[in-house]
Amino acid sequence: MTEQRMALVASPTTAAQEAATELRAIYEWHPIERADLVVALGGDGFMLRTLHAMLDRHRILPVFGMNLGTVGFLMNDWKPDLLELRLQQARAITVLPLRMDVETVEGQRHSVPAINEVSLLRETRETAKIEVLVDGRVVLPELVCDGVLVSTPAGSTAYNLSAQGPILPLESSLLALTPISPFRPRRWRGAILPNKNAISFRVLDAIKRPVSAVADQREVRDVSLIRVGIDKTSPLTLLFDPEHALDDRITMEQFAV
């Protein structure tokens, strides 16, 4: 197998920087511009920033993460030894990001990628009133809530989970549609949709009840219309150790207390 050129990126935390120093003393590293893959040291948040940086540069490489953060759901165990062999044996999982297209009440338009989720949030003490459409069909004429989000499998253990949304297997072709503190309809607790569906939101009474739209950490305020769908033009690749029990972690996360 041809030797792959590795680039190293690390979170600014002390643990990640110390690990990076250790790896630099053992292996040969290359700038991202000349690399074939990226080794990322940190937690899930740093992995998210690494993937967004590649989307911004329009140069997308496979990423092998090692956990030096807290949860590390998208990361492998930290081990400095035999890294090149681990990379050769790694299992690749494709993650499709979301694309959020929004229009504001003033007519401005924005298009923003999201890897974890797109969330709509009320901006004031007034509850949001939102019409929900799937593939152009109105499925909820009026959702009264603090907000609502669309999550990818990669993001389903993050904000989605804290909003009582379902955990989705990382390799599934599904999206979670999860309300945030819903008031009406009282019995609606969300939906699981095929990722081929296009999801749209119309903000009702957007002047009195302003809503912001957030794609991961990128916010657009005072929105009126939001369209969310999978972006198949920018697939991301995460690399995992063959023994990485991802399915087991997904299962056990649902019973965490």
UniProtKB/Swiss-Prot annotation:
List of residues binding NAD(+): 44-45, 49, 116-117, 146, 154, 157-162
Record-level GO cellular component terms: cytoplasm
Enzyme Commission designation: 2.7.1.23
Matching Gene3D superfamilies: Probable inorganic polyphosphate/atp-NAD kinase, domain 1, Probable inorganic polyphosphate/atp-NAD kinase, domain 2
Catalytic reaction list: NAD(+) + ATP = ADP + NADP(+) + H(+)
GO molecular function, one term: ATP binding
Residues of the active site: 44 (proton acceptor)
Keywords linked to the UniProt accession: ATP-binding, Cytoplasm, Kinase, NAD, NADP, Nucleotide-binding, Transferase
UniProt-listed NCBIfam families: PRK04761.1 (NF003406)
Protein name, per record: NAD kinase
Organism: Rhizorhabdus wittichii (strain DSM 6014 / CCUG 31198 / JCM 15750 / NBRC 105917 / EY 4224 / RW1) (Sphingomonas wittichii)
